[in-house]
Amino acid sequence: MARTLGPITALLLGVAFLLAGTGLQFTLLPLRATEEGFSTLAIGLMGSSYFVGFVGGCLFSPYLILRAGHIRAFAAMVAVATAAVLCHAIAIEPSTWAALRVLTGFCLAGLYLVIESWLNDRASNDNRGLVMSAYIVVNYGAVTTGQMLVTLYPRAGFEPFALAAILLALAIVPVVLTRSAQPAPITFVRFRPLHLYRAAPVALVGSFMIGMANGAFWGVGVVFALGSGLDATLAATFASVVVAAGALAQWPIGRMSDQVDRRVLLAMLLGGSIAAGLALGLLPATPTSLLMLGFAFGTLALPGYSLVAAHAYDKMPAGEAVETAAGVLLAYGAGSILGPVLASLTMAGVGPGGLFLFTAAAQGLLLAFVVHRARVQPPLPASAKTGFDLAATAPMGAVITTEPLDVTDPLVAVPDTAPAPQPDADPAPRQQDEPTR
């Protein structure tokens, strides 16, 4: 294991810093916004703005990377994301924060693309599963840790924003100092929803509706916790418990889905998450009950994306893996744009519990659709399924695939930039007439 992970340790360390800073922002910004008197709708719009930027980054950041190269593009996007964090502390105004979240979402999508392209390039058929699984474990672990860092400093001060900026800035150090050669293949996004729907309707509709429900939690989950009587520390703990529960459940649920109809298992998870959501939204709240129900909700709701992504891989041709991954991720992102706004409107009407009443409604609609599809279309035999892959079905980026990227694929490109110099190697002399890239 050490021999396999050693060459990518720098990348994983960069991921840990990057995602810790991101997780801190997901909790810090709703907490500070509530203390500043932002309306629930304004906070929901902030959550949606992040996913607007994320979808935009999925679509357009590949062109930035092709133009500048992996390391320079990575450095530029980290710099912009770091500046955006600090600007939150300077300009405390809802529309400004929403615009800054768009910038952050765009940069994070591009950073995912760079990191995952390197990991894909460094992984071989023998160690791909270990490399990608390590990446996902670091990802979830860093986000959960970052959420709890909000308890270190008073939210009213500059310190938590400075800490988030420091973490983001540190992410660049192990990456720019890595001896890994670039360039690595990157993927472009082609979104053909009708093509995906004809082959796997549950995958398209499921990723969109799950994006609505899960995006609502990411956007205003902390606001729900505060409105339910938790203090800032317990609100951060609540958010971390939900995410940690979802992370722990991903692999066992995914492996279970290899043995049964994924749609049936998804329906069972949806039924359980609806029950947990209704309990969170309607029952009297105590710290213990909220944490327990939050754990149940995370266990049942967050792995849903992995199931619909795996279902999409089952139904789509193997040669369209890149397009399939991008299509499911963009549908999830589109749902995540709507979710926080609609949930915040529900909360404004019925109170904090409206968040989970909204998630239950979205999941209920999806449950009805999944049951209908399971009745009209027979399940695939186990032998015809694509084995569940934790990394390829996580809602992180569209570039991770179960096989190495095919550079002849029209959706795959290699930046035309020189590789990073290797140790003890002299850089190639530049010709006088060579244009500066």
Stretches with model-predicted labels:
Residues 29, 110-123, 302-317:
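Intracellular juxtamembrane helix-capping segments at the cytosolic ends
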Residues 150-151, 163-185, 366-375:
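C-terminal membrane-cytosol helix-exit motif in multi-pass small-molecule transporters
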Residues 72-87, 165, 264-279, 357-360:
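Structural signature of the two symmetry-related core transmembrane helices
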Residues 69, 90-95, 261, 283-285:
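Helix-breaking motifs and short loop linkers at transmembrane-helix boundaries and internal kinks
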Residues 102-137:
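Cytoplasmic helix-loop-helix junction between adjacent transmembrane helices
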